[in-house]
Amino acid sequence: MQASAAFTHRTGIDTICLRPVAVFDAEGYERMLKSSPRPAGVGTAWHMGVHIDVRDVAEATLRAVETTFRGHVRLLLCANDIADRRPTLELVAEHLPHTDWRGGREFTDEPFRSLIDCSRAQEVLGFRPRYGWPGR
């Protein structure tokens, strides 16, 4: 990504780096939902249940190609919810017990809310993920 930023700086050619996490398609969802017992999640400490549907990645990619944005930007992409049966606060308490919680009421109102803020992708591309974890 530093190379992309340097490239844009040197040449003036625009670059958008999309950073999706744990991309799932229909078969991937099915495999995860059938695994028994389900791994401490897909929601283990290394990504805390953050995921995105391949269809949303395709949509963000199309928007990145068609945007009028100028310059260089890195954009995180993830679903609005997490890939786990346990609420987000439980995952945080389990995997990060010594970390002071700074989340707000939004995690009470949306107990499976993702810990990743992807609002920049909405600002730059008008992108909002449409797909969440199946069954939710």
Language-model features, listed with the residues they occupy:
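Mid/C-terminal beta-alpha module of Rossmann-like enzyme folds, strongest
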Residues: 58-118, 123-124
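Glycine-rich beta-alpha junction loops
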Residues: 21-24, 81
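Active-site Tyr-X1-5-Lys
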Residues: 1-15
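Alpha-helical substrate-binding/gating segment
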Residues: 23-26, 31-75
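Gly/Pro- and small hydrophobic-enriched strand-loop and loop-to-helix capping segments
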Residues: 130-136
